[in-house]
A protein has these predicted regions:
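Solvent-exposed soluble domains appended to multi-pass membrane proteins
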Residues: 1-175
Length: 175
């Protein structure tokens, strides 16, 4: 997205929230605002991490104290986090986790139409068709915060975690 696109989105969102704030239902409303990966990453076979770094915002002035979180997470973590912010006690069927919990493990799930990626810490595993797997180390630079370096050896613990997370989510979805 261009700078102009970001500025317009910011303007439009601000106008929407300003108009909503004058409505009688505003104090009883939670706004969850997020994005999807950018259009230029759709259909690609490689997984460009920088195109999957997206914003998310939970806005509910009557319920949620303003703050900022700089953790690596995924969209699946939004609802568990929201329920936690609202103080809701519930039995979780969510695959995501509350990103504000002390035991939250920072990780991200990213995918293209063929490849599945799993980022945890500085290790990025890419699962591809026909039992192919690659691993990379995240090596940020001043010019590229998402620079990846292919590893020679596969970390089997990280590989097995990536496989098990995607397999269990697939099986769970078939129930």
């Amino acid at each position: 997205m261009t700078a102009g696109g970001v500025m317009y989105s910011d303007y439009a969102l601000g106008g929407f929230l300003d108009a909503a704030s004058r409505e009688p239902w505003f104090d009883n409303t939670v706004f969850v605002i997020t994005a999807d990966h950018c259009a230029s990453s759709a259909g690609k076979t490689e997984i460009p991490l920088e195109k999957y770094h997206i914003p998310a915002m939970i806005y509910a002035p009557a319920f949620v104290t303003p703050g900022s979180v700089g953790k690596t997470a995924s969209q699946i973590d939004l609802m568990p986090t929201l329920f936690s912010l609202l103080g809701m006690d519930y039995d979780s069927w969510f695959y995501g986790r509350d990103i504000l919990a002390d035991d939250f493990r920072e990780r991200a799930f990213v995918a293209t139409y063929q490849d599945l990626g799993y980022l945890e810490g500085d290790r990025f595993t890419v699962l591809s068709p026909v039992d192919r797997a690659e691993q990379f180390l995240l090596r940020p630079t001043d010019d590229d915060p998402y620079a990846l370096e292919r590893t020679e050896a596969i970390d089997s613990t990280h590989l097995n975690r990536a496989i098990s997370l995607y397999q269990t989510s697939s099986q769970w979805n078939k129930r």
